[in-house]
């Protein structure tokens, strides 16, 4: 109840929707703004939405937090009446907050605003919270700015005028010339509501105070005009009056105490509804007198600025928006809200859908439909031109035959009249066919210009979709991918090899098609290559395959003609006229020649050292390039356009610049290679130890348990003369088998005799650890 509320609380200003706090110290002292101003209008304090009011616009917007990290959150916004509600999702179940738009300033942010997002705009108010919102696209931004601007201008003359916090004059109340007088401090504690809220709660508790039928008929007519015409959202043009003067923002709005016969409202409403200062677009003379109550004895003396008329308090015209907002039913707040599927406001949604992805999908579909229509028209015109061309050739042949007959008949005897008549008919028919052919050619050129424009527009659209695919939001990426697939499918259907596209080259001397070569279109980049010398930058990155375009279909994005230029069957050799103008250049190497050249360059590299042991020989034969010929063979890969791309796959040990690892084909082969590589690594490690003398004791005997490497039987010749063992000697340190601490049998089979030095290693035998490293890197 009002009696239990603290003395300092929120009060709602009537004309500007401002919030100020009442000072409990002195009624004359200017009040200060509430610190927790951002909590107003959120969740429990939000306005309750009227389901009977039409919805002007709804959609997704990004809202920036007012405090903390100022993160962006995606919310579902609905503009109903003059209030902007936002929800968590599109089901519109529980409102998260509301923004009363009259007297708000809606402005878009400039390009240099540090918002972190594009398409942002700001809704600010001198005494209220500033909302920073962002749309997804520029089209959505324009729609929201237009709708929110109309809702914010519904206040009337106060929009766009400077608002100075003027102090009340001595003869005026705190609300202006027509405001109520000052009240005492005792009344200030229990009278802290704005006139609109008090009027609303009193009218809702006692609906019998409403004006009789004339006023009700007037308000019903206003409601019908508001639902049918959007002109109510434009500012009204009328001469200024004392009521249209700006009210002080810091002055608290008070109302006089209720008359003795009136009862206090049962409870303060949960939502400050009817704060919208919407004045009906009618003259304020007799209607104001009809809609207002008679002045009470507590009202102050009339001011001089009123022109002799009784002073008008905001209590008089606060009833008008209340009747409009209630739509003839003052008890609608007690009714449960309708489910979203049965709301009448969804039917009254004006304009096209607001989803930008849906708009873009419709644009893509429309563009592809026009492109297909122009393609069919081009094909039909080409068929007619071919028929007329064939008929023209037949007529020319018939005329040639008739001319020969006439010449022969003239030499022999007099020319018959029938032959002359036939020649005349053939000539007339030939003239008619040529005229028709010229008309069809001009029509085809006109259609082709339209087709080229559509292709350019489609290329721009594909660039936009690819930009969204890489840098857009997740929803935009999904929609862009679907549209790109649709575009590629349509272009693939239009550019099939079984449908040669009709096109006449611009350099052709005759408008008529010249054979099969002129009946096919070429892409713009290929035409430019014929007229300009090819630079090394243009050749860089082109796959080996001559002049065939083996690149991906995305190369045609920037070109105007992207429909059929990607298929190699649709490509053709340049015409003789264009070929004579092109500079003579050295022919490109084919794929086979390039692969043969690469193979010769690899064979010129440093060969691997020949192993001396049988195991190394076996391993070398297993992993030699000759035995791995299937791995380096040329494999044709058929691309999407039917062309063959030549690839080369080889192990990392044979081609240092090839980063493709070698993978064994079968599990058995892999295990065999692993076992051989392990044996090779062990043997190389022991061989290195024996070469450096690290595994010999002081007598020169090998350490126990260390196997000796076998010797190559082909290299065992006449042993050199014996020599005493010398420590750290690489040539004589392997003698005296069985002396010292015998090591027992070794797993390597044959061993050297006592005193016989091992065979001398070749100079390049030290490269085997590199072979081991390369072999291990292959796995």
UniProtKB/Swiss-Prot annotation:
Q: Which residues carry this modification: Phosphoserine?
A: 164, 559
Q: List the Gene Ontology MF annotations in alphabetical order.
A: identical protein binding; phosphatidylinositol-3,4-bisphosphate binding; phosphatidylinositol-3,5-bisphosphate binding; phosphatidylinositol-3-phosphate binding; phosphatidylinositol-4,5-bisphosphate binding
Bias (Basic and acidic residues) occurs at 184-193, 536-551, 594-603
Gene3D superfamilies, alphabetized = Pleckstrin-homology domain (PH domain)/Phosphotyrosine-binding domain (PTB) (2.30.29.30)
Keywords from the UniProt entry: Cytoplasm, Lipid-binding, Membrane, Phosphoprotein
Biological process, per Gene Ontology: positive regulation of canonical Wnt signaling pathway; positive regulation of Wnt signaling pathway, planar cell polarity pathway
State the InterPro entries in the record.
PH-like_dom_sf, PH_domain, PKHA4-7_PH
> Which PANTHER family does the record associate with it?
PHOSPHOINOSITOL 3-PHOSPHATE-BINDING PROTEIN, PLECKSTRIN HOMOLOGY DOMAIN-CONTAINING FAMILY A MEMBER 4
Q: Which domain of life is it from?
A: Eukaryota
Which regions form coiled coils?
none
- Annotated localization: Cytoplasm; Membrane
PROSITE patterns xref list = PH_DOMAIN
Renumbered to this chain, region (Disordered) spans: 152-352, 492-670, 691-764
Biological role stated in the UniProt entry: Binds specifically to phosphatidylinositol 3-phosphate (PtdIns3P), but not to other phosphoinositides.
UniProt lists compositionally biased (Low complexity) regions at 525-535
The way it spans or sits in the membrane comes to: Peripheral membrane protein
Q: What is this protein called?
A: Pleckstrin homology domain-containing family A member 4
Q: Where is the composition biased (Polar residues)?
A: 315-332, 647-663
Which coarse location class describes where this protein primarily resides? Answer: cytoplasm
**Domain PH residue range list:** 54-153
Is this entry keyworded Membrane?
yes
